[in-house]
């Protein structure tokens, strides 16, 4: 990625953001790493031997707009400026449309949508003043196609994608770019938490899960270009099918049973592996 840069990341205690934090620090960059769970974030830093001179660890509840203002301002004071902000923190709680508890509706919308909007808003204001910067928002394949069993989650990821592309249209002329990353299922603790949830079967479909290394490649090689794209789909073939179903939703019920069968089979295999490991 050339010269060293200053990054601001959310959700760094686990999953994609934890992996990216370690990679960025290994490349010599500085990272302002945040998570709602500071203790888990500190544990991740110790486990990864993150260099204290180039990383700052702070608690951040992405649902709190005032917290965003304060923590991002601290990051600017610490590093002088932020080159790239990655809104990665997310929440997946699968449930059938008739059964999703109200608190889960609120929590997914608050974390996945409001968290990204608050973060993009704060980072964009800082970057516009500098005349340059890049904001990367993690959406999902669920932002490209309807997903039975995850109606609320899919709605939040559609919102993240639409917001990111709309904001990019506004900001590009000011030197600031926004890119939405839309991956298929990624093997992370967030997805592991849905292993025993039958409503999440579609997210376990397909011949394999993406790895955090593949998301790293998509971000570093495809998103972080001199002129960043509006969105990046990972992998290309599966997301093309998702876009097709989005354009022609009536074909969804034709494909869905096959993918649900595949997902349930994979869930059963993973559950059996979990039992054997105990």
Task: Report the location of each language-model feature.
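Active-site helix of classical SDR
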Residues: 120, 156
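The beta1-alpha1 cofactor-binding region of Rossmann-like NAD(H)/NADP(H)-dependent oxidoreductases
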Residues: 59-70, 102
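Conserved glycine-rich Rossmann-like NAD(P)H-binding loop of the short-chain dehydrogenase/reductase
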Residues: 27-43
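Residue(s) in the substrate-gating loop at a strand-loop-helix junction
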Residues: 140
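SDR active-site lid
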Residues: 172-236
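Canonical Rossmann dinucleotide-binding motif of NAD(H)/NADP(H)-dependent dehydrogenases/reductases
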Residues: 2-32
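Substrate-binding pocket helix/loop in short-chain dehydrogenase/reductase
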Residues: 96-97, 101-109
């Amino acid at each position: 990625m050339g010269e060293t840069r200053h990054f601001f990341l959310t959700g760094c205690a686990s999953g994609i953001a934890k992996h990216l934090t370690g990679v960025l620090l290994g490349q010599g960059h500085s990272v302002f790493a945040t998570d709602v769970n500071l203790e888990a974030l500190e544990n991740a830093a110790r486990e990864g031997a993150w260099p204290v001179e180039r990383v700052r660890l702070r608690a951040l509840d992405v649902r709190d707009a005032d917290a965003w203002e304060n923590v991002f301002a601290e990051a600017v004071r610490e590093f002088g400026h932020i080159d790239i902000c990655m809104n990665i923190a997310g929440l997946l709680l699968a449930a059938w449309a008739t059964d999703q508890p109200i608190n889960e509706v609120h929590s997914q919308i608050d974390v996945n949508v409001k968290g990204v909007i608050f973060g993009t808003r704060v980072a964009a204001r800082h970057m516009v003043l500098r005349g340059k910067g890049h904001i990367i928002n993690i959406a999902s394949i669920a932002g490209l196609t309807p997903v039975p069993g995850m109606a609320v989650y899919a709605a939040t990821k559609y919102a993240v994608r639409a917001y990111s592309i709309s904001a990019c249209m506004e900001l590009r002329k000011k030197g600031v770019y926004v890119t939405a990353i839309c991956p298929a299922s990624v093997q992370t603790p967030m997805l592991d938490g849905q292993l025993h949830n039958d409503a999440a079967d579609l997210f376990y479909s397909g011949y394999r899960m993406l790895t955090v290394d593949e998301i790293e490649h998509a971000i570093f090689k495809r998103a972080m270009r001199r002129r960043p794209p509006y969105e990046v789909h990972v992998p290309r073939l599966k997301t093309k099918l998702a876009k097709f179903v989005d354009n022609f939703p009536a074909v969804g019920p034709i494909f869905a049973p096959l993918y649900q069968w595949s997902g349930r089979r994979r869930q059963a295999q993973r559950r059996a592996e979990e039992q054997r490991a105990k």
